[in-house]
Amino acid sequence: MTPLQQLAATIEARKGADPASSWTAKLLSKGPEKCAEKFGEEAVEAIIEAVKGDRDALTSEAADALYHLLVMCAARDVSLSDIEAELESRHGTSGLTEKANR
């Protein structure tokens, strides 16, 4: 199991947990809108570090953004497997072709 798969499994396991017991459970208990807001904040922080050129800070913020992306998706019952399947369906297709087919 990859670290991303392990993270997704942990997030899934926290869906029904007591919000007082974990940050993930607390965030999920606040609903998809709050999860989306938090993902947006983390994505902006990653963008800032990318612009600044700080590789270590970007790596850290990218990890935070990936975590919050998975939490946001879990809040809407979209799993990492769903995302992987979507990526697999696009594999081998030009990005321009894929975009035109949407």
Swiss-Prot record:
It comes from the Bacteria. One of its GO terms (molecular function) is ATP binding. Keywords: Amino-acid biosynthesis, ATP-binding, Cytoplasm, Histidine biosynthesis, Hydrolase, Nucleotide-binding. Gene3D superfamilies: MazG-like. It catalyses: 1-(5-phospho-beta-D-ribosyl)-ATP + H2O = 1-(5-phospho-beta-D-ribosyl)-5'-AMP + diphosphate + H(+). Pfam families: PRA-PH. Belongs to the PRA-PH family. This is Phosphoribosyl-ATP pyrophosphatase. It comes from Jannaschia sp. (strain CCS1). The lineage of its organism: Bacteria, Pseudomonadati, Pseudomonadota, Alphaproteobacteria, Rhodobacterales. The gene is hisE.
